[in-house]
Amino acid sequence: DATSDLVFRTSSGQVVNTLQGIPERMRIKSDGHVLPAITNTQDLGSSSKRWRNVYTTDLQLSNEGKTNDVDGTWGNYTIQEGESDLFLINNRNGKKYVFLLKEVS
């Protein structure tokens, strides 16, 4: 229910009496999901203000709609944890990889 969402907007410092025309920046949905207003426009942290830890299950990575700096393509990957390995799944072609890890002491 969108009426139960918490919405963050910015107004460029002017006093306003209505939300009309004030751009939405972020939304915390009533189901607990935190979403940017527009895809690929917001950062979580910055180069000088970083989050200490991120606790997640699988890690979804995609730069769809943009290209990388190395070969100009885009990707969509998932990193998953196994008991003794880390796995990388290419969500575009279905190929699966294991990270080659070297134990250090």
Q: What residue ranges belong to the model's regions?
A:
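Extracellular/surface-exposed low-complexity repeats and stalk/linker segments enriched in Gly/Pro
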Residues: 57-74
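Beta-strand-rich receptor-binding modules of extracellular spikes/adhesins
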Residues: 1-54, 76-105
